[in-house]
């Protein structure tokens, strides 16, 4: 009996092994898929774009792709690509924002190496006007054309990254929104800038981005995220998180206040000509938003334009119209990921470079600059579909018979004679 029982148990074990072997033999594809899913979920070598980070994508408010693209006027002549030209190639590095002083000098611009520089004409060239910290040094911070690559990102917290610039035309002071050092100011002679706002409600301002100055002296500025700094801005877009804020600094009391919160990558900001409202861009949600400062709608927020791509800064011309810099364009595949966070979570965990994942979604970034009236009606659209002049755009300034175009990613400025003369 013992022998039979033992023999039966051995036979049973043999059948179990046979069953397992049979599954592996007859279902290799399923096994590979299962192992691949486990590998992707664990991402042991941090090969995916999120690189082993905690990643919590969420749905966010973005207008339907088809609705936006059907109503958006296109520049089929790609006039920006035709008429634009590159300026100061490899002499400026990531010139995000462009500003001109009360004497008409400029442009002034903030660079990826942490400096604010100004153009002094061909005889002098570019000179350093300001830095945002006394810790800045040429040895630690100056990397030339490499400043706009991720080689510089690990140095940004030390060197600073000046983004939005605005002159107070009455005092000649230049106000700076720096991604790491918050809101700062420097006098007409330049030098090391003085911090004004680094915290709000006792917590650090993690990603100051752009600003504008109200006639009463208040400074409105954007704080893009409470979770991610500029070096990690990529994750703000991927997750669709909305912890950004619109802030106001009050010079008499030296205090900073939260005006609006729960924003998805608040970016550029511009007061209206009569200063009854301000416009700001939400990059993640691809839209231009109005915040009322005066009148019956004071304190209310409304979307004035849904955009075909990802907006950066917004600037006003002398007529009170608004130029918006847009990195174009959205794709239907992006909408699928936005509406289905679980798919997005899997997609960006794939051990594939981000460049290839973006290409698979049909993304081909190029520049669109658009002029709006105060109600959000599109007045003009200029495109550079082949990226001849600019692939990633940050700001448009209409000054001295030109459109001056900045970029956070390239080592040049672009310009276009304006108004355009049609041949």
List each language-model region with its residue ranges.
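Beta-propeller domains
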Residues: 11, 65-73, 77, 102-145, ...
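Beta-strand-rich domains and repeat architectures in extracellular enzymes and scaffolds
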Residues: 23-33, 42-73, 78-116, 387-394
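Short, conserved, GDST-rich strand-edge loop motifs in beta-rich repeat architectures
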Residues: 52-57, 221-241, 327-364, 415
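Surface loop/turn motifs at the tips and blade-to-blade linkers of beta-strand repeat domains
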Residues: 86-91, 130-133, 153-158, 196-203, ...
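Residue-level detector of Asp-centered blade-edge/turn motifs that repeat once per structural unit
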Residues: 101-104, 167-171, 213-216, 273-275, ...
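Short loop/turn segments that connect beta-strands within beta-propeller blades
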Residues: 120-124, 187-191, 249-254, 292-297, ...
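Asp-box/WD-like beta-propeller blade repeats and closely related beta-sheet repeat scaffolds
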Residues: 143-163, 168-173, 177-237, 241-244
């Amino acid at each position: 009996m013992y022998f039979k029982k033992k023999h039966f148990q051995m036979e049973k074990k043999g059948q179990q092994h046979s069953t397992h072997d049979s599954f592996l033999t007859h279902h290799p594809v399923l096994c590979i898929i299962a192992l691949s899913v486990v590998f992707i979920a664990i991402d042991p070598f941090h090969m995916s774009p999120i690189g082993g980070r905690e990643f919590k994508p969420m749905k966010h408010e973005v207008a339907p792709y088809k609705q936006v693209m059907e109503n958006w006027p296109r520049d089929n002549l790609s006039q920006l690509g035709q008429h634009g030209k590159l300026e100061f190639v490899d002499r400026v590095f990531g010139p995000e924002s462009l500003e001109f002083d009360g004497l008409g000098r400029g442009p002034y611009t903030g660079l990826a190496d942490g400096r604010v520089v100004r153009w002094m004409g061909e005889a002098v060239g570019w000179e350093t006007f300001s830095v945002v910290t006394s810790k800045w040094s040429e040895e630690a911070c100056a990397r030339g054309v490499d400043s706009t690559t991720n080689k510089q990102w690990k140095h940004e917290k030390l060197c600073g990254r000046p983004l939005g610039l605005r002159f107070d035309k009455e005092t000649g002071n230049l106000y700076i929104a720096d991604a790491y050092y918050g809101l700062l100011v420097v006098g007409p002679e330049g030098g090391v800038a003085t911090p004004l706002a680094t915290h709000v409600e006792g917590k650090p301002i993690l990603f100051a981005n752009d600003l504008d100055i109200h006639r009463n002296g208040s400074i409105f500025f954007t704080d893009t995220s409470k979770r991610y700094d500029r070096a990690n801005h990529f994750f703000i877009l991927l997750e669709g998180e909305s912890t950004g804020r619109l802030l106001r600094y009050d010079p008499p009391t030296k205090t900073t206040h939260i005006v609006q919160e729960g924003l998805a990558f608040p970016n550029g900001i511009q007061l209206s000509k009569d200063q009854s409202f301000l416009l700001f861009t939400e990059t993640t949600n691809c839209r231009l938003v109005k915040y009322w400062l005066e009148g019956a709608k004071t304190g209310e927020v409304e979307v004035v334009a849904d955009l075909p791509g990802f907006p950066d800064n917004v600037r006003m011309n002398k007529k009170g119209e608004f130029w918006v810099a847009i990195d174009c364009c959205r794709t239907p595949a992006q909408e699928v990921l936005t509406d289905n966070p679980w798919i997005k979570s899997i997609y960006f965990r794939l051990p594939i470079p981000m460049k290839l994942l973006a290409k698979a979604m049909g993304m081909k970034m190029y520049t669109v600059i658009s002029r709006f009236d105060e109600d959000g009606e599109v007045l003009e659209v200029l495109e550079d579909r082949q990226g001849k002049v600019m692939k990633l755009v940050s700001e448009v300034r209409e000054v001295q018979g030109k459109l001056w175009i900045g970029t956070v990613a390239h080592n040049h400025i672009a310009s276009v004679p304006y108004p355009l003369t049609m041949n």
